[in-house]
Every structure is written in structure tokens, then in C-alpha cells.
């Protein structure tokens, strides 16, 4: 076996195409979009490079010259020094079922990160936001993957754990049948808050992107801005997020709650893009874009992908959550475009959101695990802190808020 750094078009093509071998017999597999992967490693498109971020990629070739594995290692300037110990990252890991091959790939990451001066690595994660390429699938390997979520063979888990990685936190993915009415507990609370004539719930059809961004910013900063390890969002970030959704946005499923003119909650979803991307074979070249736009325009969609759900602090637990769920059932479902929803990225460190999800009548659909490995075994390991439980010592290596935009 030979490990080669990605340095040109040939090795980049091998980095992208290695999945063809690994998932050749997996009927559920839908590849990530090539262009989504490539922009992560493009200094012109990934702002982390301008902030001093560093990255390296490798492809592992077998005895016959075929690509049999890949991996990337990186130092994110926003998160590397978030805690007491500098931590880098590794991700985009793919490998045949061969432990020696897996060790070669992980060793490459470790050695490179040690040279960069960090003491540990999280993985598999993204060199960017948490909404894509984050976590290792460790529960429920049946069914097609959702857009942006990692999908992998079951044997990857043994590679990570045998190498010494430990579970830092889990990302939970839930499924809900939209035909099921909102649970009684939500209806009762929703009715109470709805009795206030100032309260309303609305979709965003006809609302400008600039206004949606300002609503999003206000609720996000109120809901998460004060949590340990979270920073307030800037308006430029909010605008960028909404702009990135432009082509795929369905304003009817961008749901906001208001008290008067003040936004106090949101339940934001997009169409499940993999219902369309399954037809483009992982490539949005000109032909892939044509097929995607055709599917987007004419294919009947079934699933919406919940990307973020939040309520301003002062209104949490007062029925706003239920009112937005009730609105979805009474207004969105009768439109006939969606039958079910996938609620992604609920961290197991977020008990408040887990309680809300538990009362929604959802089913746990998948679990993805973010692992952490300290290179020095004498460094004490701690799981991700639970939101709302502020530690006496500020020694946990939290991820920066800017890495969890669009997630719960």
C-alpha cells in the first residue's frame, strides 16, 4: 500500500472517486456532491484558510494501483484553541475493510497534526461548519442518507475505537410522520400562547431574504448566544446562510413565531435534497445541474429536512415550540408537498431540545458519533459539556459557535 498526498488533479480525482469501490454493493449509498467536497479544500472558497487554517489530504493506493482509502487532517483556527488543550481535526475518512490501511490513514493525520503543534484530534469532522461531513454513522445503517450527513459502513466504528478514539458526543437524527397531529402537550401550550393577540406564526413566502436573515439572527442570538462555548452570530453570517439556501429554499417551510413584530422562534427546513441528488451521481457539473433542476421542478417531493429549531430564551417552554409544530401540521401538511420530516443534528448534550423532540412523536432514525483522541494519554478525557450545565473550570474543548450554525 502507498500513501500519497493530494497535490494535483489526478490525486484529487482519486480522493473523490475512492467511494466507488467502497460502496459498490451498497444500494442505499448516495455520494456527497463532488463540488461540495472540493470547496472545503479550496482556499478561494473556504474562509478558514484566510484566517490561518491549514489542511492536508491523502489517498491510499492498493497493490494494483487502485484507490482504497482517503483522509484529511486540518487545523481550524476558530476552534483549535477553544479549550485548555489545542485540538485539530480529521475527516473525509473512507477505507476498505482492512485495519492496516485504516491505521496508515489515521497515522498520517496524527503525525501531521503533531507537527502542527496540537495535542489531539476530533473526527471524523468537517473543515468548516457542522451541517455537512460531520460524525461517524454508528447506529442504523439501513435507508438512504440525508443530504450533507455522513454515511459509512459499520466497520468504520471499530477502526476509530481500536485506534484509541473515544466518544465526545453524539449527533442524533430523528424521523417524524407529518400526518400525525401535534401531541396534546404541544397543543395545550400552543393554545395558551396563541391566546395572546400579539402572537403569530408565519411562513416566509413573499418575505425578502434580508428580512429572513434579520429574523434568524435575532432568534439565534437569543436562543444560543449566552451558552458556554457559543458566540453571537453576526448579520453577515446570517445573510450568508440564507443566501446559500436560495436555490433550494421553500419559503413555506421556513417557519417563524412572532410576538408582535419581534421574532421569537424558528423552525427552519429545506426539501430533502438527496431525493433529487440521487440522480446526479455525486456531480453537479453542467449535466448534473440540469438533471437536478429538472428533478427539483418536476419531481414530487416527500421529505423535508429540519435544519434548525430554536426559541428565544424568555419564551422557551411557553408553548412557542408547540405552536410552530401545530402550524406545520395545520398549514404546511395540507399543501400536499411533504409527508414526513427528518430532524438532523440534535446533540446529545442538549437536554432541552431532546425533551422537545421526545414530545414530538418522533423516532430515532440515526446516530452519528464525534470522536476525540488525545495524543498524550495523560490528558484527562471529558465528553462535550451539557448545555445549561456550566462547569466550574473552563477546561472543556468546546467547538466554536460558528461551527454549529444551522444545528441544534
Predicted segment positions?
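A conserved beta-strand-loop-helix scaffold within acyl/acetyltransferase catalytic domains
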Residues: 19-63, 71-81, 203-310
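Acyl-donor binding region in acyl/amide transferases
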Residues: 80-164, 281-360
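Active-site proximal loops enriched in glycine and acidic residues that flank catalytic Cys/His/Asp
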Residues: 258-259, 267-273, 307-313, 328, ...
Amino acid at each position: 500500500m502507498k500513501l500519497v498526498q493530494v497535490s494535483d488533479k489526478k490525486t484529487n480525482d482519486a480522493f473523490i472517486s475512492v467511494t466507488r469501490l467502497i460502496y459498490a454493493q451498497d444500494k442505499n449509498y448516495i455520494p456527497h456532491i463532488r463540488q461540495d467536497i472540493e470547496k472545503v479544500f479550496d482556499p478561494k472558497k473556504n474562509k478558514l484558510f484566510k484566517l490561518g487554517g491549514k489542511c492536508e489530504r491523502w489517498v491510499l493506493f492498493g497493490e494494483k494501483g487502485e484507490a482504497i482509502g482517503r483522509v484529511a487532517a486540518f487545523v481550524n483556527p476558530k476552534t483549535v484553541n477553544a479549550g485548555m488543550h489545542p485540538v485539530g481535526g480529521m475527516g473525509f475518512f473512507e477505507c476498505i475493510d482492512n485495519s492496516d490501511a485504516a491505521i496508515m490513514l489515521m497515522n498520517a493525520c496524527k503525525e501531521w497534526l503533531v507537527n502542527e503543534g496540537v495535542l489531539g484530534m476530533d473526527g471524523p469532522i468537517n473543515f468548516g461548519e457542522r451541517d455537512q461531513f460531520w460524525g461517524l454513522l454508528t447506529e442504523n445503517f439501513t435507508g438512504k442518507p440525508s443530504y450533507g450527513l455522513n454515511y459509512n459502513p459499520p466497520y468504520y466504528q471499530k477502526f476509530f475505537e481500536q485506534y484509541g478514539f473515544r466518544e465526545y458526543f453524539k449527533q442524533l437524527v430523528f424521523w417524524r410522520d407529518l400526518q400525525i397531529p401535534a401531541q396534546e402537550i404541544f397543543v395545550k401550550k400552543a393554545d395558551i400562547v396563541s391566546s395572546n393577540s400579539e402572537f403569530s406564526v408565519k411562513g416566509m413566502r413573499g418575505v425578502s431574504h434580508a428580512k429572513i436573515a434579520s429574523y434568524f439572527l435575532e432568534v439565534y442570538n437569543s436562543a444560543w448566544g449566552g451558552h458556554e462555548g457559543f458566540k453571537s452570530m453576526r448579520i453577515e453570517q446570517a445573510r450568508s446562510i440564507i443566501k446559500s439556501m436560495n436555490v433550494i429554499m421553500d419559503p413555506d417551510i421556513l417557519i417563524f413565531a412572532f410576538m408582535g413584530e419581534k421574532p421569537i422562534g424558528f423552525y427552519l427546513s429545506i426539501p430533502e435534497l438527496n431525493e433529487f441528488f440521487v440522480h446526479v451521481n455525486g456531480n453537479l457539473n453542467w449535466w448534473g445541474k440540469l438533471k437536478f433542476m429538472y428533478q427539483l421542478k418536476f419531481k414530487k417531493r416527500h421529505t423535508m429536512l429540519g435544519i434548525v429549531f430554536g426559541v428565544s430564551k424568555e419564551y422557551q417552554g411557553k408553548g412557542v415550540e408547540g405552536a410552530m409544530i401545530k402550524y406545520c401540521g395545520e398549514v404546511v401538511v395540507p399543501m400536499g408537498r411533504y409527508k414526513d420530516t427528518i430532524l438532523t443534528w440534535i446533540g446529545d448534550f442538549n437536554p432541552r431540545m431532546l425533551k422537545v423532540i421526545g414530545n414530538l412523536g418522533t423516532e430515532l432514525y440515526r446516530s452519528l458519533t464525534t470522536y476525540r483522541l488525545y495524543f498524550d494519554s495523560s490528558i484527562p478525557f471529558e465528553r462535550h459539556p451539557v448545555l445549561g450545565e456550566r462547569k466550574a473550570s473552563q477546561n472543556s474543548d468546546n467547538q466554536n459557535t460558528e461551527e454549529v450554525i444551522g444545528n441544534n
